[in-house]
Curated annotation (Swiss-Prot):
Organism from which the protein derives: Caulobacter vibrioides (strain ATCC 19089 / CIP 103742 / CB 15) (Caulobacter crescentus)
Binding site for NAD(+): D49, G50, N119, E120, D149, A157, T160, A161, Y162, N163, L164, S165
Top EC group: transferase
Cofactor: a divalent metal cation
Described function: Involved in the regulation of the intracellular balance of NAD and NADP, and is a key enzyme in the biosynthesis of NADP. Catalyzes specifically the phosphorylation on 2'-hydroxyl of the adenosine moiety of NAD to yield NADP.
Name assigned to this protein: NAD kinase
Length: 260
């Protein structure tokens, strides 16, 4: 999971639209230089977890490692903010490599929509009526009918986000599993979800779709009126996040399981 990296000297700074993030970017760029994302060895993201997610999506093509510092409200994926010794911190950082989920959603017009999700792919009811979903794993029907507000498939990195709020399990970052979690399940009432191997191919079929429309969301990419949703891990895409020594993502995931 953790790999050594070459000595880093070229940084690109990105920031959210929060004033404190923009002010931090100006100071850090003046102090350490700013080469632009295309020439950077590491991208420094200044904001919260939402901005980190956005930055990871933008780095999919280049796969440039990202070191985040918290200048937002939620900073689970971010390092503590400090302007001192930034190059030393980055060069001593631990690297967590993650793989996104690849979603193919087919809507009511039979149009295919493709997107990648770093945290989760979620299916959500669009109206007051519950959704009805059929779930297949590797071509075999495992749940004939799930009556619910929705369901999601989360990566280890995303297991502490929406998945945790939906009472799904927290997965160690190097866990070779995905979390399949129902959202407010009505039937079967006692079903709490499942842990699937990372190689699993998951298919959701939306039942009674005309009466009970469902949207499919890959992080922030939404497909309305979904009919079928196919999800698998994209092992060909690797994204790297850098964390201060002793504060790795693995340690944060472990600590989260003992938080009040």
């Amino acid at each position: 999971m953790y790999q050594p990296q070459p000595f880093v000297t070229r940084l690109a700074f990105k920031c959210s639209d929060r004033p404190e993030a923009q002010e931090a970017r100006e100071r850090l760029a003046a102090r350490y230089g700013d080469v632009g994302p295309e020439n950077a060895q590491v991208i420094v993201a200044l904001g919260g977890d939402g901005f980190m997610l956005e930055s990871l999506h933008e780095a999919i093509a280049s796969q440039t490692p990202i070191y985040g510092m918290n200048r937002g409200s939620v900073g689970f994926l971010m390092n503590e903010y400090s302007e001192d010794g930034l190059l030393e911190r980055i060069n001593a950082a631990e690297r967590a490599v993650i793989h996104p989920l690849a979603m193919v959603a087919i809507d009511a017009r039979r149009t295919q929509h493709r997107a990648l999700a770093i945290n989760e792919v979620s299916l959500l009811r669009q109206t007051r009526q519950t959704a009805k979903l059929r779930i297949s794993i590797d071509g075999k029907v495992r749940m004939g009918e799930l009556v619910c507000d929705g369901a999601l498939l989360a990566t280890p990195a995303g297991s502490t986000a929406y998945n945790l709020s939906a009472h799904g399990p927290i997965i160690p970052i190097d866990g070779r599993v995905l979390a399949l979690t129902p959202i407010s399940a009505f039937r079967p009432r006692r079903w709490r979800g499942a842990l699937l191997p990372q190689s699993a191919r998951v298919t959701f079929e939306i039942l009674e779709a005309d009466k009970r429309p469902v949207s499919a969301v890959a992080d922030n990419f939404e497909v309305r009126d979904a009919m079928e949703v196919h999800i698998s891990e994209d092992r060909g895409t690797s994204l790297a996040m850098l964390f201060d020594a002793g504060r790795s993502l693995e340690e944060r995931v472990l600590a989260e399981q003992f938080s009040a």
